[in-house]
């Protein structure tokens, strides 16, 4: 049996007990055929092109972790109809130096969430715009998780079966997408 494909998970919220982090962990548990690793972004210094010739160790670590993965999953809350600043910074750090983006050709998916009913629609679409520009082949199926604060029990476990079923289906679609992109990898990287 072959090794499961690895997925770097970038969680947009920095809060230790964030609902985004809980959702990322629940998604990983519901998608057992993939290996998920959360890549921390909270310690990344702000992107500054002046630092590219001698990049901070945190940038180097982040870029290596993303580059080593077969795919990337973004799980993000919505802040002011967009993505959190820390997530945008991580995207910028990974996109540099010019011509060496760790995102290029790496299959991806986006899950957005919010306490309201629209599930982070604005964040999801803003993030997708950046990722398409960076040549991340994104799963076309979109995932908006609304009323996110009501989905978890006191111990952080996902208690909403409808959401669990949706995430299982999304995980199956993402897994198939990763396989499809891996089969077409030379063409995707050349784009």
Task: List PLM regions with ranges.
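N-terminal beta1-alpha1 ligand-phosphate binding loop
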Residues: 2-33
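A generic structural motif
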Residues: 31-37, 136
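Glycine-rich phosphate/pyrophosphate-binding loop and the adjoining helix
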Residues: 2-4, 8, 137-191
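N-terminal beta-loop-helix "entrance" segment that forms/cooperates
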Residues: 40-58, 154
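A general structural signal for well-ordered alpha-helical segments in protein cores
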Residues: 7, 20, 24, 44, ...
């Amino acid at each position: 049996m072959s090794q499961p494909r690895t997925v770097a998970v970038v969680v947009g919220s920095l809060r230790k007990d964030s609902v985004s982090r809980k959702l990322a962990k629940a998604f990983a548990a519901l998608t057992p055929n993939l290996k998920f690793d959360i890549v921390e972004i909270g310690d990344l210094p702000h992107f500054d092109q002046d630092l590219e010739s001698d990049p901070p160790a945190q940038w180097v670590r982040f870029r290596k972790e993303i580059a080593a993965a077969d795919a990337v999953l973004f799980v993000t809350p919505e802040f002011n109809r967009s993505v959190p600043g820390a997530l945008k910074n991580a995207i910028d750090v990974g996109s540099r130096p010019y011509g060496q983006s760790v995102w290029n050709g790496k299959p991806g998916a986006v899950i957005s969430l919010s306490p309201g009913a629209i599930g982070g629609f604005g964040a999801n679409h803003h993030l997708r715009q950046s990722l398409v520009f960076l040549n991340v082949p994104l799963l076309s199926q979109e995932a908006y998780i609304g009323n996110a604060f009501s989905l978890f029990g006191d111990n952080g476990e996902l208690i909403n079966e409808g959401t669990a079923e949706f995430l299982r289906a999304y995980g199956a679609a993402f897994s198939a997408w990763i396989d499809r992109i891996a089969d077409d990898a030379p063409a995707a990287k050349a784009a």
